């Protein structure tokens, strides 16, 4: 079986996912076109050597529908022979793309695959695609559906974390992201987005707040208390009977931001990279996905990480750096507690609380950020993990070469 290597990673800046966000006027295919062209240029890549493109998109409707992967390949004027597929594993879609690409390469069926994802949340809001999970009353009742924020607040209640704990984590995310941006740590991977006239739209992550304070966060109202009062708390408490009530601690300041963004990663075999004249940056050592309890929904990273670590023959302490998606503050907090991680090795450049979570792209962004930081610090191994809608987890372990 062939090894799968990472050859390059590019991403857009993340723009505020509202109509006044700097990337709102950029269509999803324009974001991808920007990245495909940048990857081709910086690698002097003969695109006819690429076998396939695998892209994640959580809301594949409107401009993001109809297999945007293939549309973007053609719009970027890559070789006509490069195929494309679009998929969704909810929030994990970007990392799932990388794992699917790695599996294709390891099987020997393909030698170079571009993986990644896109989400324009300002143009196509989360939930625009509907789905039986939330909208079919029979399914809803049978599965015990509750919004993710209810699950996040339930985790905080079960783990004994209050507002000061989750707010402190959120403040640290902004502080670390601000330092990383000031020190140009993201510059290797970030590709500025320009409009059709060549004018700059955005060249940095738009939502980082260096001034984020605990006092300001304390003034924010809980985001999910009203949803809980409408009946979702009762739904969750029917399964979690040791809890008398859910303490609603999450709000806009300690949850992931709604943003626009895209990311790509070139994955290939050693032979495929050599044919393209490229040197590998890292080897994809192991990957795993797993299902978890769907009402609380956000506890999947821990078992997914344990599954991936077992495949790699590693313990959590063998991993130098971790990227744990900050969907809500409690997700990395719980995963780190479960695995016994040193928080100085977790999300060292901030995360989705500070920079946002463009659903289909985030997993790819996390893995690329992880690789850049491993190289900057001259470290060896890293792991990226995300919680996933519907009660799932995903994890990928990489090793520099």
Where would I find each of the regions flagged by the language model?
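N-terminal extracellular/periplasmic Venus flytrap/periplasmic-binding protein-like
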Residues: 10-13, 24-25, 29-34, 42, ...
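Conserved catalytic cysteine-centered active-site region
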Residues: 26, 57-111, 142-150, 218-257, ...
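Glycine-rich loop/linker segments at domain edges
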Residues: 12, 16-19, 103-159, 229
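Active-site-proximal alpha-helical scaffold in enzymes
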Residues: 87-118, 156-186, 265-271, 336-337, ...
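Active-site pocket-shaping loop/turn-to-helix segments
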Residues: 14-41, 59-62, 85-99, 111, ...
């Amino acid at each position: 079986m062939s090894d799968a290597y990472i050859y390059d990673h590019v991403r857009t800046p993340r723009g505020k996912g509202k109509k006044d966000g700097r990337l709102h006027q950029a269509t999803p295919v324009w974001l991808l076109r920007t990245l495909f062209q940048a990857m081709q240029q910086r690698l002097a890549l003969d695109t006819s050597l690429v076998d396939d493109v695998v892209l994640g998109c959580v809301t594949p409707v409107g401009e993001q529908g109809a297999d945007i992967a293939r549309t973007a390949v053609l719009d970027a004027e890559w070789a006509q022979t490069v195929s494309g597929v679009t998929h969704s594993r909810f929030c994990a879609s970007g990392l799932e793309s990388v794992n699917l690409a790695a599996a294709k390469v390891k099987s020997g069926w393909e030698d170079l695959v571009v993986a990644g994802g896109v989400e324009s949340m300002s143009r196509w809001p989360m939930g625009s695609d509907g789905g039986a999970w939330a909208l079919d009353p029979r399914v809803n009742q049978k599965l015990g559906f509750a919004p993710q924020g209810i699950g996040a607040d339930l985790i905080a209640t079960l783990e004994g974390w209050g507002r000061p704990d989750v707010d402190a984590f959120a403040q640290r995310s902004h502080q670390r992201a601000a330092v990383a941006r000031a020190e140009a740590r993201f510059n290797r991977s970030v590709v500025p987005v320009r409009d059709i006239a060549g004018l700059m739209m955005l060249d940095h992550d738009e939502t980082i707040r260096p001034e984020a304070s605990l006092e300001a966060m304390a003034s924010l109202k809980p985001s999910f208390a009203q949803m809980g009062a409408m009946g979702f708390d009762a739904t969750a408490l029917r399964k979690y009977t040791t809890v008398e009530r859910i303490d609603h601690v999450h709000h806009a300041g300690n949850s992931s931001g709604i943003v626009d963004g895209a990311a790509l990663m070139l994955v290939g075999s050693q032979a495929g990279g050599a044919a393209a004249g490229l040197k590998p940056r890292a080897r994809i050592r192991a990957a795993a996905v797993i299902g978890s309890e769907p009402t609380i929904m956000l506890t999947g990273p821990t078992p997914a990480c344990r599954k991936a670590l077992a495949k790699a023959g590693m313990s959590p302490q063998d991993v130098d750096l971790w990227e744990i998606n900050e969907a809500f503050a409690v997700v990395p907090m719980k995963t780190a507690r479960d695995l016994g991680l040193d928080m100085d090795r977790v999300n060292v450049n901030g995360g989705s609380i500070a920079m946002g979570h463009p659903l289909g792209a985030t997993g790819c962004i996390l893995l690329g950020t992880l690789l850049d930081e491993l190289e900057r610090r001259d470290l060896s191994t890293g792991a990226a993990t995300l919680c996933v809608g519907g009660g799932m987890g995903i994890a990928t372990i990489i090793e520099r070469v």
